[in-house]
UniProtKB/Swiss-Prot annotation:
One GO MF term: calcium ion binding
Similarity comment: Belongs to the small GTPase superfamily. Rab family.
Gene Ontology annotations of biological process type: histamine secretion by mast cell; histamine secretion mediated by IgE immunoglobulin; vesicle-mediated transport
Designated gene of the protein: RAB44
Segments of skewed composition (Low complexity): 532-559, 736-759
Residue numbers spanned by region Disordered: 1-40, 113-133, 339-405, 419-483, 495-827
Composition bias type Basic and acidic residues, residue spans: 443-467, 676-685, 783-810
Xref: SUPFAM superfamilies: EF-hand, P-loop containing nucleoside triphosphate hydrolases
Amino acid composition bias (Polar residues), ranges on this chain: 688-697, 710-727
Residues that bind GTP: 840-847, 888-892, 946-949
Protein name: Ras-related protein Rab-44
Coiled-coil regions listed in the entry: 191-315
Database matches in NCBIfam families: small_GTP (TIGR00231)
Membrane topology: Lipid-anchor
Species name: Homo sapiens (Human)
């Protein structure tokens, strides 16, 4: 601290001396000006210009510290001095100096021996001083004492090696000692201070350089470390990526290997399958070749047998001709032998001779019994009904039952094989066959069962007329047979009818080769099964035909057995549905039906005419109700054609239905018969006659009132018998593979104890109002209903014996989707009846949906709906019976006007679209516009998307359908008619919605009714 204060005082003294020296020239006038200091040497200027040129400062225009590091000036002592000189010159610490600044700075420092602060001219000293200054000797020439003092001073300062020119300091020191000795001490202090500062700056520089070198080394080390770490991280990443790539490659390789192995196994399996298929194909080819060869052999055998058959027929014709000739020749011989028989003559037994041993008529001897012979060779009368058999005749069996399929193999599908009135070839045996146990003769009643005399009046279907000259069709029995079975044409067999000669026998007669069997084997298991016990006179056995006695093969059934046996099916007996007949046949049918109603013996004969079988009388045909003969002429059908079985026939299974009832359905003329004739119906089992007459009148009235409702039904009736193969198979009776009948239907066949008599009726027929209340289906429904399952025509539950007045639906039995109660005909008294119309574009699946809903089966070959179709669906929802009249409309544009007409009375509408067709979904709004144009505001609407099974081809999402349904405020759902998914649920929900809407409407009506306008009082009140 003291040293610093002393130094500052010395500086102030030095400054004061300077100020005094500067003022001296101004004070002294006329003083001479001091000479100019020593100028900047030309050598230094040349070195400076060379320095500027070498370091490039001349081009740049400035000088930096780095440029001075390589500079070599003669006036500088060392490299450190050059760096320090830059610090002296760079006062502003900019780091760079221009050429002028650097040159002026150097000149100020090294240009003169004077201090850079003494720039002005001083007043010239007195002559003594000038002379002394000029005469101041150099350091070498100075005194030793002064020289030692100066050297000691320099050693004290320690700056001898730092200053560039010691001579200048010597001169300055000497000058100060001579001129101003008081400033010598200040010079020493100044030099000491500057030296210390230079030393401190040098030390700081060295420290900074050391720190810089250390920082540089640390920086290089850190950079190297970071570089090494980065390299190591890069190597690790590369190794990791390589490992992942290798593992992925191994996994893909193993996966591809597994796939290749699986493909190879599949190829091997396919190759094995191909080899197996080739083996099967070769086996099938060989089998086909064998079958073809066998077929060819069978064809040859068939042709051979046909030739033999023609040959036998020719021989038979020749035999008949010879027999006729023999009759004419030997008639007198027969009379003579009958009048005078020989005592020793023995009549040969014709039964003992075999067919091979029977001689021709021309080869007979004189002792032969021609009467017996002629009776054996009797031919059927002209005009008798003939049957054309498709299978070859089989030999008679002595015992054992016969399957019903043989009966249904009668082929009458080719009625044009013989002309009307032409007699086809009869049985190869040449003799007509009578029914088992019954023989006819012109002389006596040989072979007739004792019970035949008792039941002959009750069996009009058996023509036992003793008069041989009477025509078969002239008797009441014949006409009744014609009226009953003239239209009994089932799909399994048909009858070729000669028009002029007489009516045919019943179509339910057994074939001529029906085997003999005991009466215990007679069972009424199926009304269509023509077993050994169900018999009728065949075509060849006519009364009075002149046939000789034949060996009886079976006794006729007794009274109990006949009551047990099912008669002709009520379906075929009542409807008369058959193939298209010529007009003359229909006229004959019309005349015989009218003639039947006028016979006096009808009341007695119809007592046991028909035994009603199970509710499925003939599964090959659709039961369409009674068809009046007047409608047959006009080509129309009654309204009950589509209504199912009439109420008069919906009785318990096994109950006997009289001919009075039966005749009341086809025509109204029988309604005028006296009740005394109807009172003779002993086979009704105690049924009330008043209910029968009311039933007849109701049915006849219904047929009469609906005479003009359904035109053009003739084509419908003609098309019904064209049964499908399935219907023909079903018509052949029950097979072991068939399932039992559904619940609610009585069992097939006769009930235990049915032989004692018919069962009692359980319920009276419906009234006229009930029949009129039932909805009548449209014209297009008959063919669609014909294709339905056989169990869809079950009898009503009212006819069950266990609960006469309770329906299965009313009892709480919820029908399943396949239950016939759920899809049967409409109920007589349903709880709710609604009209539901299906709308949508063509080919969206409306018909398939309704077919699946009604038939429980998906049909693949349905054609487009023409106009409109109609179905009735009965549902039990929440213990309520719903009858839904489902209208299937056509989606084609040409039928839209008809669809709009139907929308006026619709209670519910199902808008159906195809989820695989965006166009059908877009057309939903068009159908809604049609619905609004029709004025149906309060209609319950269901938006239904079909074909959920085609999910891959879906174009309309579920969200789009839900959004549209929310926008329109309707119900929404999706279904699949092909898979049967969500079929019944939307219909059930629709029925509930319709019921809620109707109940709400009723409640609103109840609420509105009490609100009456207040009574107006008079003006005086």
């Amino acid at each position: 601290m003291e040293t610093g204060q002393r130094t500052s005082r010395k500086v102030r003294k030095l400054g004061s001396n300077r100020r005094r020296q500067t003022r001296e020239p101004a004070d002294g006038e006329g003083a001479a000006v001091a000479p100019e200091p020593e100028s900047w040497s030309s050598q230094a200027a040349a070195e400076l210009q060379a320095f500027f040129q070498d370091c490039g400062a001349k081009e740049r225009g400035f000088v930096t510290r780095e440029d001075l590091a390589v500079a070599k000036f003669s006036f500088l002592g060392s490299k450190e001095e050059s760096e320090m000189i830059f610090d002296w010159v760079d006062v502003e610490r900019k780091g760079h100096l221009s050429l002028e600044e650097f040159s002026s700075g150097l000149k100020n420092i090294f240009g003169s021996s004077q201090s850079p602060h003494r720039l002005r001219r001083r007043k010239p000293l007195p002559s003594k001083r000038v002379s002394a200054t000029t005469s101041f000797p150099a350091l070498e020439e100075a005194d030793a004492e002064e020289k030692e003092a100066f050297l000691a001073f320099m050693e004290q300062l320690g700056t001898g090696h730092l200053l560039p020119k010691q001579m200048e300091i010597w001169q300055l020191w000497g000058q100060l000692r001579q001129e101003e000795p008081q400033l010598a001490g200040n010079l020493a202090g100044f030099l000491a201070k500057m030296t210390s500062r230079l030393q401190e700056a040098q030390a700081d520089k060295e420290a900074l350089e050391l720190t810089l070198r250390k920082r540089d080394s640390d920086h290089h080390r850190e950079v190297q470390q970071l570089y090494e770490e980065m390299e190591q991280q890069i190597r690790q990443e590369k190794q990791q990526l390589q490992a992942e790539s290798d593992s992925r490659g191994l996994a893909l390789t193993s996966q591809m290997q597994d796939v290749l192995e699986a493909k190879e196994r599949e190829v091997q399996r396919l190759a094995e399958g191909q080899r197996e298929l080739e083996a099967q194909l070769s086996h099938l080819r060989s089998t086909h070749q064998e079958a073809a060869s066998e077929n060819q052999q069978l064809q040859e055998a068939k042709r051979d047998l046909a030739g033999r058959l023609e040959e036998v027929r020719g021989q038979l014709q020749v035999t008949r001709g010879r027999l006729d000739a023999a009759r004419g020749r030997v008639s007198w011989q027969v009379e003579e032998k009958l009048s005078f028989p020989g005592a020793g003559e023995k009549t040969p037994d014709p039964q003992a001779a075999s067919p091979e041993e029977a001689p021709l008529p021309g080869l007979f001897g004189d002792n032969d019994d021609w009467d017996q012979l002629l009776s054996n060779f009797g031919s059927p009368p002209h005009g008798a009904l003939q049957l054309c058999w498709s299978p070859p005749p089989t030999p008679r069996a002595t015992s054992g039952p016969q399957t019903p399929r043989v009966v249904r193999q009668i082929s009458i599908s080719e009625p044009q094989a013989f002309l009307f009135g032409q007699e086809p070839s009869s049985d190869p045996d040449g003799a007509p066959r009578t029914p088992p146990g019954v023989t006819f003769s012109a002389k006596d009643n040989k072979g007739v069962d004792p019970h035949e005399q008792d039941i002959r009046a009750e069996q009009p279907v058996e023509p036992h007329d003793p008069d041989p000259n009477q025509e078969p069709g002239s008797t009441p029995e014949g006409r009744l047979l014609w009226g009953l079975s003239g239209s009994l044409v089932a799909p399994a067999f048909k009858v070729l009818i000669p028009l002029e000669d007489g009516p045919p026998p019943p179509a339910n007669s057994p074939p001529p080769q029906a085997p003999a069997g005991s009466s215990k084997q007679i069972q009424a298991s199926d009304p269509d099964d023509k077993g050994p016990g169900s018999w009728a006179p065949p075509s060849g056995a006519q009364p009075g035909a002149g046939a000789g006695p034949q060996e009886p093969t079976q006794t006729p059934p007794t009274m109990t057995e006949r009551e047990t046996q099912p008669g002709p099916s009520p379906t075929t007996a009542l409807t008369g549905v058959g193939p298209a007949k010529p007009p003359r046949q229909r006229d004959a049918l019309q005349q015989d039906l009218h003639a039947t109603g006028s016979e006096p013996r009808l009341g007695t004969q119809r007592a046991r005419a028909l035994t009603l079988g199970p509710a499925e009388p003939f599964q090959g045909l659709e039961f369409v109700g009674p068809v009046p003969t007047e409608r047959l002429e006009q080509g129309q059908a009654g309204p009950a054609v589509q209504e199912g079985l009439p109420e008069g026939l919906r009785e318990a299974h096994g109950q006997v239905l009289g001919l009075g009832e039966l005749s009341a359905f086809p025509h109204q003329e029988l309604e005028e018969e006296p009740r005394s004739e109807e009172g003779k119906q002993e086979g009704r089992g105690g049924q009330d006659l008043s209910s029968e007459q009311s039933e007849q009148s109701v049915e006849a009235h219904g047929l009469e009132t609906a005479h003009s409702e359904l035109p053009q039904q003739d084509s419908l009736l003609v098309s019904l018998p064209s049964a499908t193969p399935q219907a023909q198979v079903e018509a052949e009776g029950p097979t072991p593979g068939k399932s039992a009948p559904p619940r609610g239907s009585p069992p097939r066949g006769a009930q235990p104890g049915a032989g004692a008599g018919p069962q009692e009726p359980t319920q009276t027929p419906p009234t006229m109002a009930e029949q009129e209340a039932q909805p009548r289906p449209s014209l297009t429904t008959a063919h669609a209903e014909e294709q339905g399952p056989p169990h869809s025509r079950e009898p009503r539950a009212e006819s069950r014996l266990e609960d006469p007045g309770m329906d299965s639906r009313e009892a709480g039995l919820t029908p399943s989707p396949g239950d016939p109660m759920a899809g049967g005909g409409p109920q007589a008294n349903p709880d709710y009846l609604f009209h539901v119309i299906f709308l949508g574009d063509s080919n969206v699946g409306k018909t398939s949906f309704l077919h699946l809903l009604h038939q429980n089966s998906f049909a693949t070959g349905l054609t487009a709906t023409v106009g409109v179709d109609f179905r009735v669906k009965t549902l039990l929802v929440d213990n309520k019976c719903f009858v839904l009249q489902l209208w299937d409309t056509a989606g084609q544009e040409r039928y839209h006007s008809m669809t709009r007409q139907l929308l006026r009375k619709a209670d519910g509408v199902v808008l159906m679209y195809d989820i695989t067709s965006q166009e059908s979904f877009a057309h939903v709004r068009y159908w809604l516009d049609c619905l609004q144009d029709a004025g149906s505001d309060g209609v319950v609407i269901l938006l239904l998307g079909n074909k959920m099974d085609c999910e891959e081809e879906r174009q309309v999402s579920v969200e789009a359908g839900q959004q549209l349904a929310q926008e329109l405020g309707v119900y929404f759902g999706e279904c699949s008619a092909a898979l049967g998914h969500n079929i019944l649920e939307p219909v059930v929900n629709l029925a509930r919605s319709l019921r809620m809407q109707e109940e709400g409407l009723k409640d609103s009506l109840v609420k509105v009714a009490p609100k009456r306008p207040p009574k107006r009082f008079g003006c005086c009140s």
